[in-house]
């Protein structure tokens, strides 16, 4: 009879541990992008990023080969079945 309250308390403690660890895992991640906001103010950094963006836009996409269509499957010629 005294075992039921102990099981309930133990279950509640396990539930709290699982939910706390789930919250810790969900909140983990990369740091905020606001950390890097001070670096963006320099004109040299802005100019370099503009130059890199222009270079990426001018990149030739034909450098990676050509896209040839897959060969179509042709039906084999009809073969007569001998009687």
From Swiss-Prot:
InterPro entries: CIF1/2
Reported induction: Induced by excess iron and further synergistically regulated by lowering the medium pH.
Superkingdom of this protein's organism: Eukaryota
Cysteine pairs bridged by disulfides in the record: none
Traits of the deletion mutant: Abnormal endodermal barrier formation in cif2-1. The double mutant cif1-1 cif2-1 is defective in ion homeostasis in the xylem due to defect in endodermal barrier formation in the roots. Highly sensitive to excess iron. Retarded growth under low-potassium conditions. Repeatedly interrupted, discontinuous Casparian strip due to patch-like localization of the CASPs proteins. Reduced rosette leaf size.
Cellular-component GO terms for this entry: Casparian strip
Sulfotyrosine modifications at: 64
Region feature (Disordered): 61-83
Signal sequence interval, chain numbering: 1-28
Keyword Cell wall biogenesis/degradation found: yes
Coiled coil (UniProt feature): none
GO-annotated molecular function: hormone activity
Tissue specificity field: Expressed exclusively in the root stele.
GO biological process, one term: regulation of root morphogenesis
Purpose of the protein: Peptide hormone required for contiguous Casparian strip diffusion barrier formation in roots via the regulation of CASPs protein expression and distribution in a GSO1-GSO2 signaling pathway. The Casparian strip is required for ion homeostasis (e.g. iron and potassium ions).
PANTHER family noted in UniProt: PROTEIN CASPARIAN STRIP INTEGRITY FACTOR 1-RELATED, PROTEIN CASPARIAN STRIP INTEGRITY FACTOR 2
Subunit description: Interacts with the specific receptor kinases GSO1 and GSO2.
Name of the protein: Protein CASPARIAN STRIP INTEGRITY FACTOR 2
Naturally occurring in which organism (per UniProt): Arabidopsis thaliana
Gene symbol of the encoding locus: CIF2
């Amino acid at each position: 009879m005294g075992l039921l309250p102990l099981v309930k308390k133990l279950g509640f403690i396990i539930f709290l541990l699982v939910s706390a660890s789930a919250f810790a895992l969900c909140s983990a991640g990369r740091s905020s992008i606001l950390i890097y906001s001070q670096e963006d103010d320099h004109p040299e950094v802005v100019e370099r990023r503009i130059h890199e963006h222009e270079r990426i836009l001018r990149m030739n996409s034909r450098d990676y080969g050509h896209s040839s269509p897959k060969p179509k499957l042709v039906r084999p010629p009809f073969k007569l079945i001998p009687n």
